[in-house]
Each structure stands twice: as structure tokens, then as C-alpha cells.
Amino acid sequence: GKSSISCLVIDDKTYDSAYGKLNNTFLHTTTYNGFGEETVTALEALNILSEPEFKNKVNQLSDLLSKKLTILKDNHSDKIEEVKGTGLLNGIIFKSYSSSLAEMVEKIPINLIKNKSFFLKKLTATVISAELYEKYNILTSINDSENSNHLNISPSLIIGNKDVDYFFSSLSAVLKSNLNLKTLDLIFNFIKSKLK
């Protein structure tokens, strides 16, 4: 199915500063309009969001996630630099915890990698995400920004406590494992792609 719903919520002051002058506007627009089924979908989503059971589920999952993230960070403080976020939208920033890989990355020509420390942290998150998928069938994402290197932790609302426990036990197992070979493979493929 499809669900092309969008919304912009903004206060008057911000709106005026962003859109108030024609010469400095960056026009926020959407191509989604005139689709009746999207209106029905949006209304049903609002109905679900307003149900007390939904709010209770979100609060319960948020509390559980917060506790599990704190425990994970405490148990792996040598590998986790920071846990960010709130509710069901969180991220884990990892340290680049392999000194041998750090030495190897230092030898990569500087023009291929602008910020080697950031690259190592993003590489670490990438390898952890790949291991979660390949070994535990858990699909995660890494923030795909030049300024961010965190593993996104934002579970679907259809999961239960057993799913949360499985995720954190799997992530803990990955953090206890030796990721050097997987990381070397990713570095090799990265360099190969840059030299083409």
C-alpha cells in the first residue's frame, strides 16, 4: 500500500522568518494532494493515536527501552560513547574501539577520509548493524548523515517485551564479539569504491 501523508507544524514567528519574504523563502511544499485514500488513512492514524491503549503501549515501551539502553551502556561503557534520544526515538553512538583498525585507517590516504575519528565511529556502527542483520535477523539503520554516526534505535509499535529483550541480548552479544574481520572487509570495499 501507500501512505503519502505529510504535515508541517510551525509557530508564526518561525513561519514568518522562513517564508515571510519572497526573496529568502525555501518553500516547503508537497506533491501529495487530492488523494482521498490518504485522507482516510490519516484520519484512522489520528484515531489510533488518540486511543488510551496506544498511549499506554508507547509509554510502556519507552520506559523499557530507556532502562535497557542504560543497562547496555553501563555493561559496554568501553564500546558505547553515548546514548541519545527519548521515548521510542533513540540512537547509540559507539566508540571506535579497535586500536589495530585505528592504526590501519591512519594509513588510508587523507583525501579519501576527511575525519578519520568520525569515520571509525561510523564504521563501527555500520559493522554492528551488519552483524545484527546477518547473525540475528535484526534490521537496524545508521543515521546517513555526514554529521552523525549513530545506530538508530526506534522500534515499531507492534513489538513486545520479548522482542525488546531479543534485540538487546543480540546487540550485547555483537558488542562482546571480535568485529575486526568484518570491519576489515568493509574498509577494503570502501577503499575499492573510492579508487574506481
Question: Regions from the language model: what does each represent?
Answer:
Residues 1-196:
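Conserved N-terminal phosphate-binding loop of PLP-dependent enzymes in the Aspartate aminotransferase
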